[in-house]
């Protein structure tokens, strides 16, 4: 299977997000890379499903709470920017204060 660098990056994000979700489901607090991967994957998949930028910006903010992540992680992530492929074009989705 021949994958472009972008496709490889998306697969790594997806894998990291799956691991993060599994840990979250077990009640294990997420670290920085896991939290970012989970939110990023949500945005990438949502764009693929046909959601709008506004929907994703709103929904991604409700994905994780401070109780889901290790101490100090929420403050380390003031925003996440994801370049996602939507049905009509590629757009930059900015999620401000992604961990409530």
Curated annotation (Swiss-Prot):
pH dependence: Optimum pH is 7.0.
Entry's EC annotation: 3.5.1.5
Subcellular location field: Cytoplasm
MF terms in GO: nickel cation binding; urease activity
Keyword Aminoacyl-tRNA synthetase applies: no
One GO CC annotation: cytoplasm
Pfam families the record matches: Urease_gamma
Record field: catalytic activity: urea + 2 H2O + H(+) = hydrogencarbonate + 2 NH4(+)
Temperature dependence: Optimum temperature is 60 degrees Celsius.
Keyword entries, A-Z: Cytoplasm, Hydrolase
Pathways per UniProt: Nitrogen metabolism; urea degradation; CO(2) and NH(3) from urea (urease route): step 1/1
Main location: cytoplasm
NCBIfam families: PRK13241.1 (NF009712), urease_gam (TIGR00193)
Similarity remark: Belongs to the urease gamma subunit family.
Subunit structure, interactors included: Heterotrimer of UreA (gamma), UreB (beta) and UreC (alpha) subunits. Three heterotrimers associate to form the active enzyme.
Protein name in UniProt: Urease subunit gamma
């Amino acid at each position: 299977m021949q994958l472009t660098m972008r496709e490889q990056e998306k697969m790594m994000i997806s894998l990291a997000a799956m691991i993060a979700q599994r840990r979250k489901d077990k009640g294990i607090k997420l670290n920085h890379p896991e939290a970012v991967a989970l939110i990023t994957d949500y945005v990438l998949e949502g764009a693929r499903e046909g959601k709008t930028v506004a929907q994703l910006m709103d929904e991604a903010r409700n994905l994780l709470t401070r109780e889901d992540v290790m101490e100090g992680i929420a403050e380390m992530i003031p925003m996440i920017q994801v370049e996602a492929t939507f049905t009509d074009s590629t757009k930059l989705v900015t999620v401000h204060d992604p961990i409530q």
